Amino acid sequence: MKIRLHTLLAVLTAAPLLLAAAGCGSKPPSGSPETGAGAGTVATTPASSPVTLAETGSTLLYPLFNLWGPAFHERYPNVTITAQGTGSGAGIAQAAAGTVNIGASDAYLSEGDMAAHKGLMNIALAISAQQVNYNLPGVSEHLKLNGKVLAAMYQGTIKTWDDPQIAALNPGVNLPGTAVVPLHRSDGSGDTFLFTQYLSKQDPEGWGKSPGFGTTVDFPAVPGALGENGNGGMVTGCAETPGCVAYIGISFLDQASQRGLGEAQLGNSSGNFLLPDAQSIQAAAAGFASKTPANQAISMIDGPAPDGYPIINYEYAIVNNRQKDAATAQTLQAFLHWAITDGNKASFLDQAHFQPLPPAVVKLSDALIATISS
């Protein structure tokens, strides 16, 4: 397997890496005793002074931050939250460099990444999923696809949609002879991290050996293959390209449907084919709550649940536990705590097709949030 997160972070070592106290994660926290910031309890209200928190990263998580930011500002007018959808890779890099307070990511930092860059943390915010879409006019069925077949499509060994391997999964469906056009992310992406993990798990002797998985991978040079930036670019690119197959974050489900893209049923480890709905995502996630470690670095791809959708993940805030001042640390704590409590209500999550964190994972996230200080 090939993971590029460590490479991404290693590039940053040539520049000032973290926030002011980078590398000092073992120092006793120095948060405000009035709020408990950094003192083992979570600040539930922000500082009273004006504070701006900057977020960038995952385009999958971006729609949710666009709901959270204004809602938190309405409750606390002195707090402004800026959000940008730049891709998980950029979010991780900018959080590490200290240019943003929150790097939004669909991909977790490994234990090795965190050990090499003291102070960076994975903080789970919600549960998400990834859909596989396609542009096949005239095909109304939800086609069944699995990781092995998708790997062959992205490697160029399955060249047309009426290939016997696709037909075998979809008996009775009139498949066109349209050329397969694999579409991948051009930017460093947590969506690529998730999708290529799925291919690697279901095709371990093929895709799993090369190119493997990561936020960026060396996609095979398939004639006609295309690359796009962001989930919005993936929706547009696929909608404009007959024969396209694409992996797109669940928060863009409505946009993909509005553009007429088909949505695949994906094969899981039990051989069952499912769409990414609330039931299949929650079924897949249920078995992972008790397995989630304190640092929250865990893959939930292609889990064991027979009725579970195979591409699900925690959405993460990649955060440095040392912020520039006490007001920023307190406000960041308060916002992240709000995000995993009030912000996990259906009124927010349903709009992005996300699922709430289980109570046990909320406790893990809160324990990490409590370590943020100045």
UniProtKB/Swiss-Prot annotation:
Transmembrane annotation, as ranges: none
Main location: membrane
GO biological process, one term: phosphate ion transmembrane transport
Induction section of the entry: By phosphate starvation (at protein level).
Leader sequence residues: 1-23
Matching Gene3D superfamilies: Periplasmic binding protein-like II (3.40.190.10)
Keywords for this protein: Cell membrane, Lipoprotein, Membrane, Palmitate, Phosphate transport, Secreted, Signal, Transport
Keyword Signal: yes
Domain of life where this protein originates: Bacteria
Protein name stated in the entry: Phosphate-binding protein PstS1
Species of origin: Mycobacterium bovis (strain BCG / Pasteur 1173P2)
